[in-house]
Amino acid sequence: MSTPTQSLQVKLLDPRFGDLWPLPAYATESSAGMDLRAALEAPMTLQPGDAALIPSGIAIHLADPQLCAVILPRSGLGHRHGIVLGNGTGLIDADYQGPLLISTWNRGREAFTIEPGDRIAQLVILPIVRAGLQVVDTFVDSARGAGGFGHTGVR
């Protein structure tokens, strides 16, 4: 595994980390995200259409205002079982220090049971660009212009 390029402060809020479960980690050399686990006390079944906030068992503090973290779904859970994030993407600001909760939604057609310790989401650290607004009357023309949804076609 490659050497981390950024330090991340983490609080372990669940004593099963380090004993029963490994710390969040990158699964492969080129993984962009660290898997987050369901720090549940007992199995939780999500019926079709149900949503739940699931504790990850950790809190993080990025501290660097040029970074943020995002909680993203795991592709296999979404594709195979319809388990996605209820809020699409969870955005974690650099100054947030509270527990990471995973908004989980069953958009599938069948009930799905999440077991304690299941890897249900992933955490990705991203750089942030903070823009200053410049009010203008018109924009410089671009090839796309104001073309929106579907404007460029599918072929």
From Swiss-Prot:
Disulfide bonds: none
Pathway named in the protein's UniProt entry: Pyrimidine metabolism; dUMP biosynthesis; dUMP from dCTP (dUTP route): step 2/2
Listed cofactors: Mg(2+)
This protein's record includes keyword Magnesium: yes
Alphabetical keyword list: Hydrolase, Magnesium, Metal-binding, Nucleotide metabolism
One annotated GO molecular function: magnesium ion binding
Binding-site residues, substrate: 74-76, 87, 91-93
Keyword flag Metal-binding: yes
Reactions it catalyzes: dUTP + H2O = dUMP + diphosphate + H(+)
Top class in the EC scheme: hydrolase
InterPro entries: dUTPase (IPR008181), dUTPase-like (IPR029054), dUTPase-like_sf (IPR036157), dUTPase_trimeric (IPR033704)
EC number(s) given by UniProt: 3.6.1.23
Record-level GO BP terms: dUMP biosynthetic process; dUTP catabolic process
Family: Belongs to the dUTPase family.
Described purpose of this protein according to its UniProt entry: This enzyme is involved in nucleotide metabolism: it produces dUMP, the immediate precursor of thymidine nucleotides and it decreases the intracellular concentration of dUTP so that uracil cannot be incorporated into DNA.
Matches recorded under PANTHER family: DEOXYURIDINE 5'-TRIPHOSPHATE NUCLEOTIDOHYDROLASE (PTHR11241:SF0)
UniProt-listed HAMAP family: dUTPase_bact
Protein name, UniProt field: Deoxyuridine 5'-triphosphate nucleotidohydrolase
Species the sequence originates in: Xanthomonas oryzae pv. oryzae (strain MAFF 311018)
